Curated annotation (Swiss-Prot):
Its EC number is 4.3.3.7. The lineage of its organism: Bacteria, Bacillati, Actinomycetota, Actinomycetes, Kitasatosporales. Pfam families: DHDPS. Pyruvate binds at T53, V209. This is 4-hydroxy-tetrahydrodipicolinate synthase 1. Its main location: cytoplasm. It is an enzyme of class 4 (lyase). It comes from Streptomyces coelicolor (strain ATCC BAA-471 / A3(2) / M145). The record marks T52, Y115 as: Part of a proton relay during catalysis.
């Protein structure tokens, strides 16, 4: 379910959902359905499946399609489903895009091809070929720290002319470049780094794709709601309150997948282990995550008292 709002085609509050596994490491579709239902019930109007946080490098094509089908069954039309289909191979990416469309996705998240580091003209051709292949709208995923290749602002501007390229997940840490694209296109920008949600929203972003939302789905939705209501002071306060948890989950030297699953597991929510080469968080790390979570929960309780 994409929205009717061109400024936020996949909703405002998106979670980069983890992919739950069983204790033996198999895909846990029942757990995925329960987690997805919880996320939507608590404020997410969009879910990104099989992204980085969803361990897309270590799930099979069949698992990716099954995940979309199961989550669609769980959430119905209450949330948009964006399927991560990006790979280092254009042909494979197209195959995944077609499979995601058939499984019931509303949109595609397409990352810049990694490792091969194509030049900008080849990068542009890659995205156009994927966008041409299916009828689904596309969210470009700009995260050069992981892929080794930046989707340069001028390339994004050219790609914005494609009728199915409608959005960008922004993890480039380039505020000037983001504003350049926003000023020259109608693309919907989504903050892909939790610490940048309010700053990017304040300059015209559509919303966010958050890893931290796996644990606290209502947190950043409240930031956007406060800002939209004109209470910018409260929006800033809520964003700052999130800093300890965001730092623990996203800036402590471990991938967000690892920290999100550790905290979800500690809270008794569907998650399971991560797949190799990732390794699950140790007890000390998990204790630190729980402490940051508890601090945020205590702050929220005091503000409501």
């Amino acid at each position: 379910m994409t929205t009717d709002d061109d400024s936020a085609p996949f909703g405002r509050s998106l979670c980069a959902m983890v992919t739950p596994f069983t204790g033996s490491g198999a895909l846990d579709l029942d757990g995925a359905q329960r987690l997805a239902d919880r996320l939507v019930a608590r404020g997410c109007d969009g879910l990104v499946l099989s992204g980085t946080t969803g361990e897309s490098p270590t799930t099979t094509d069949a698992e990716k399609a099954a995940l979309v089908t199961a989550v669609r069954e769980a959430v119905g039309d209450r949330a948009a489903l964006v399927a991560g289909v990006g790979t280092a191979d254009t042909r494979h990416t197209v195959e995944l895009a077609l499979a995601a469309e058939k499984a019931g996705a509303d949109g595609l998240l397409v990352v810049a091809p990694y490792y091969s580091r194509p030049p900008q003209d080849a990068l542009e051709a890659h995205f156009r070929e994927v966008a041409d292949a299916s009828g689904l709208p596309v969210m470009l995923y700009d995260i050069p720290g992981r892929t080794g290749t930046r989707i340069e602002p001028d390339t994004v501007v050219r790609l914005a002319a494609h009728p199915r390229i409608v959005a960008v997940k922004d993890c480039a840490y380039d505020l000037l470049g983001t504003q350049k694209v926003l000023s020259r296109t109608g693309l919907a920008y989504y903050a892909g780094c939790d610490e940048q949600i309010l700053p990017l929203y304040a300059i015209g972003a559509a919303g966010y794709v958050s890893t931290v939302a796996n644990v606290v789905p209502e947190l950043f939705r409240a930031v956007l709601d406060a800002f939209d209501a004109g209470d910018t002071g409260r929006a800033a306060l809520l964003q700052r309150r999130a800093v300890p948890l965001v730092e623990s989950m996203m800036a402590a030297g471990l991938p967000g997948t690892v920290t999100a699953k550790a905290l979800l597991g500690a809270l008794g929510l569907p998650a399971g282990p991560v797949r190799a080469p990732l390794r699950s968080a140790d007890r000390e790390t998990t204790a630190g995550l729980l402490a940051a979570y508890g601090e945020l929960a205590a702050d929220a309780g005091q503000s409501q008292a």
